[in-house]
Regions:
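PLP-dependent amino-acid enzyme catalytic core
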Residues: 1-496
Length: 496
């Protein structure tokens, strides 16, 4: 079963090739047109362990790999790496359920996929007979960078460069990245916001591929962002895990719908929920929760995507995005029309906006609902959830919780609700403290200790240990400097 570019049906790739390439040659994303037609036993999947679920789901989405191969890759990726054996536990909070995706090695939801991607990529290299070194380029709004470097750290045959917006991530997120160890990791701040960094990374891919700038040099580029299908596919697993937990608790019977509320920036996490739905999981409504950068809220409500608007730096920086790359995959999968998608993406590049046809808008609105939440209300929500339920959530989760309540008010006949919690509150301790009515004092580590004293909830060990780690990465670049920087690093034999 081949993947194809969202912009050109003639550009196809096997799942292994799609993982290695990251982006299609024309700048489109790889998608599986026959996703809904896969023969997948979703009910049996609910009876398996989390690793068993991952094996079945990834075999369905990445058919180049045998069941035995995938089983080994999943075991290597997840065994002993997370706080709990089920990787992503669910917690009843009030009348809703919180899906905790931050129990991995970097305390963010990206760990689920980025623990898996290096193993998939290494296996894909062997399947495709590729001897070149893989150079991973990744733009991050905060969490992807650290999780990607943690996953690829000292993996043979790979190097990774992470670009983050200078001043656009939390102090803890920055500390996680600039102290990253490993001989094959590199981090650079980019002057501008996340969209600037992400657009520049895509331009590097296009320039290097279009002009063969690395031809014959033993290096090929790939991505660890959710534009890479190998990054996106593992995220489908926790939708099944959450549903199985609700069945086990008696919240739903098998076959009854569940609504999922997802804090959304680049549209990858919520798109994984759509994939789960296409595989048969009884997903009701996928609720897209945005912060003040509410371009997706407006799009889902109106069918018009318009990035020509103010960009806000918020307390939920992983959602500070105006160009949501994975939305392109959804447009392709719902329309089946790669020419339409190519036209819309051209309009976005040239005009900064596009509008989808009415029929496509109605399809989107039949599956998705959207709401947004500003910074002040985010912090009030943190305090309210703590006071009412004694549950401590980070800023992104607070946005999702707030939008979940909006959704339930607007839709009284809603199904049971699962709120995805994407990061530990200790990654954003100052904002969380403000939400609890306290003033943050001192550096990020002192603030973490302050939050621990106030709540009695211990900070993750991986975050506490940052204080002792030396800063290794200090590069700051303009966007125009990124291509020469990548070409130079690609040719360096040793980085450290």
């Amino acid at each position: 079963m081949n993947y194809q570019s969202t912009r050109n049906a003639a550009l196809t790739a096997s799942s292994a090739e799609a993982i290695l390439n990251g982006l299609a040659p024309d700048g489109g994303l790889y998608a599986m047109p026959a996703l809904a037609g896969l023969d997948f036993d979703w009910q049996r999947c609910l009876t398996l362990s989390t690793q068993g679920m991952a094996t079945e789901i990834l075999c369905a989405l990445l058919p180049d790999f045998t069941h035995a191969e995938m089983e080994q890759l999943v075991h290597a990726a997840y065994t002993g790496k997370f706080e709990t054996e089920d990787l992503t536990p669910t917690v009843p909070v009030g009348e809703d359920t919180v899906l905790e995706l931050f129990r991995g090695p970097t305390s963010a939801f990206k760990d689920v996929a980025l623990s898996m991607l290096p193993h998939l990529m290494t296996a894909a290299k062997k399947k495709c007979g590729v001897d070149d070194e893989i150079l991973i380029l990744t733009a991050t709004s905060g969490d992807t960078g650290k999780a990607a470097m943690e996953g690829f750290c000292d993996v043979a045959g790979t190097k990774i460069i992470v670009f983050y917006p200078d001043g656009g991530v939390s102090a803890v997120q920055k500390a996680q990245m600039v102290t990253q160890g490993g001989d094959n990791t590199c981090v650079a701040a980019v002057r501008g916001n996340f969209d600037d960094a992400q657009t520049a990374v895509k331009q590097v891919f296009a320039k290097v591929g279009g002009e063969d700038l690395l031809a014959g040099k033993g290096v090929r580029l790939s991505s660890a962002n959710s534009i890479n299908i190998g990054r996106l596919a593992p995220q489908v697993v926790y939708y099944f895990r959450a549903y199985a937990d609700l069945v086990r608790r008696g919240t739903v019977a098998v076959g009854e719908r569940v609504d999922y509320v997802v804090p959304t920036g680049n549209f990858g996490d919520i798109l994984a929920g759509y994939f789960a739905r296409e595989l048969g999981l009884p997903v009701g409504t996928l609720v897209c929760a945005s912060n003040a950068n509410n371009v997706l809220t407006d799009f889902i409500r109106t069918g018009r995507y318009d990035k020509k608007r103010p960009f806000y730096l918020t307390s939920s920086p992983s959602m500070d995005i105006l160009v949501s790359s994975n939305l392109e995959r959804l447009l392709f999968l719902l329309s089946g029309d790669e020419q339409l998608v190519a036209k819309l993406m051209r309009q976005l590049t040239e005009d900064g906006a596009y509008e989808v046809p009415e029929e496509l808008k109605e399809k989107i609105q039949s599956i998705f609902w959207a709401g947004c939440c500003g910074d002040d209300e985010t912090k009030r929500t943190i305090g309210r959830v703590w006071q009412e339920h004694h549950y401590l959530c980070d800023t992104h989760t607070a946005v999702a919780w707030n939008v979940a309540q909006q959704y339930k008010t607007a839709n009284p006949a809603h199904a049971p609700v699962v709120v995805l919690s994407t990061a530990s509150p200790y990654k954003f301790p100052a904002a969380v403290l403000e939400g609890l009515g306290e003033k943050a004092e001192g550096d990020e580590f002192a603030v973490m200790e302050q939050l621990e004293r106030l709540t009695g909830i211990p900070a993750p060990k991986n975050l506490c240990g940052l204080r002792e780690r030396p800063v290794r990465h200090t590069t700051v670049l303009d966007r125009e400097e990124m291509l020469p920087f990548v070409l130079e690093k690609a040719q360096e034999k040793k980085w450290f």
